[in-house]
């Protein structure tokens, strides 16, 4: 039966007319089968369930303002809409209780959603009965994440950030020119190319490279670039 639902995502499937006290549920999910199955199952439980329009972030937020969902089921990998983590805060600010339903196994990414206001998260790999039960708990405003678990996740997130800040500290000592040279080296540019682009001598560029190596406490250009990738410096300075 579910195979018949694998076509284009329906924008709205309402099984019954909503009764008083129904809680609107918005499903922010681009997987058609899962989204449509959730709509049918939740509608059968008396919820007004609707699939979000994912044509743009602006359209999605306008739909939230109009539909006023009490609960939003949020995937984190939204294709052209980008990272769903960034959607948690604006959705909660619009009054929704956000439950993350995602295939990600990145513990810190999930912890960040909790920090931003999500009431909990559940893997897409969980049995559908568990997923439905968890959603209904959120609808009923029952906790789905214990205080201890929440504290543990946020503590892990703080620890990871402290480590990253420590690892990035040497890079903060680089001058703007040294940062540019390091970025150029990561792109595979040669000393003469870097010098020509900056209209400086090759000796100047080599001096700047020596400065980079000394500040990062590495012995070669390759090590400097590898370290920058490892600690996420390029991601922080695109």
What kind of feature is each model-predicted range?
Residues 162-204:
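Helix-turn-helix DNA-binding segment
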Residues 74-77, 102:
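Active-site residues of response regulator receiver
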Residues 2, 9, 213-238:
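Basic, Lys/Arg-enriched C-terminal extension of HTH/homeodomain DNA-binding domains
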Residues 47-57, 63, 218:
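Short hydrophobic/Thr-rich beta-strand motif most characteristic of the beta2 strand and flanking loop
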Residues 110-114, 120, 124-172, 176:
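Short, flexible helix-to-coil linker/hinge segments that flank and couple to helix-turn-helix
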Residues 188-223, 227:
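Recognition helix of helix-turn-helix DNA-binding domains
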Residues 82-96:
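Short amphipathic alpha-helix used as the core "switch/output" element in two-component signaling
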Residues 29-31:
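Conserved acidic carboxylate
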């Amino acid at each position: 039966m579910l195979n018949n639902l694998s076509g284009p995502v329906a924008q709205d499937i309402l099984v019954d007319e909503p009764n008083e006290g129904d809680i609107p549920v918005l499903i922010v999910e681009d997987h058609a089968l899962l989204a449509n199955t959730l709509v049918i199952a939740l509608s059968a439980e008396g919820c007004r369930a609707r699939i979000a329009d994912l044509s743009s972030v602006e359209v999605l937020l306008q739909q939230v303002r109009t539909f006023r969902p009490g609960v939003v089921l949020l995937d984190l990998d939204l294709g052209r809409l980008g990272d769903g983590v960034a959607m948690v805060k604006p959705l909660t600010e619009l009054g929704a209780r956000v439950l993350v339903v995602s295939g990600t196994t990145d513990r810190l990414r999930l912890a960040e959603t909790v920090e931003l206001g999500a009431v909990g998260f559940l893997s897409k790999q969980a049995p559908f009965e568990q997923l439905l039960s968890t959603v209904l708990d959120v609808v009923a405003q029952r906790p789905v994440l214990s205080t201890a678990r929440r504290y543990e996740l946020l503590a892990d997130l703080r620890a990871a950030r402290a480590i990253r800040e420590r690892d990035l500290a040497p890079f903060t000592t680089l001058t703007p020119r040294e940062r540019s040279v390091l970025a150029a080296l990561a792109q595979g540019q040669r000393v003469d190319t870097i010098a020509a682009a900056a209209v400086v001598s090759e000796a100047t560029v080599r001096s700047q490279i020596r400065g980079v190596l000394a500040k990062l406490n590495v012995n070669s250009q390759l090590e400097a670039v590898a370290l920058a990738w490892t600690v996420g410096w390029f991601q922080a300075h695109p």
